[in-house]
Amino acid sequence: MPFSLVWTDTFKRTAKKFLKKHRDLADTFSLVLHKLENDPHDPELRLHALSGKHLGKHAVSLTYSYRIVLRLVLTDTGIFLLDVGTHDEVYR
């Protein structure tokens, strides 16, 4: 069963800036979102729970250097996209 991706306003702005700066990652970005929508537990996504001040959130790898932070709501089959950027940017 596919999950619905919910683009928060913050994520929309961040993704737009990110893709403008990293045009070479546009295809990878789309592929990761497609995989996330179909199976968030796909091993290639490297989904992992966050801790500390990000408790309750998860992250998936876009590349080795870049992450997408999200809130996974499995009861409603919703995935709330929160942030995208480098490791340091998204975990600030």
Label every PLM stretch briefly.
Residues 26-34:
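PIN-domain endoribonuclease scaffold, especially VapC-family toxins
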Residues 17-18, 35:
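Short alpha-helical scaffold segments that flank and stabilize functional sites
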Residues 4-5, 43:
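Residues that recognize and position ribonucleotide moieties
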Residues 2-4, 13-17, 23-26, 62-92:
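Enriched for short, Lys/Arg-rich terminal
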Residues 31, 52-55, 70-75:
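Short alpha-helical linear motifs
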Residues 34-60:
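A short, surface-exposed loop/turn module that caps and links secondary-structure elements
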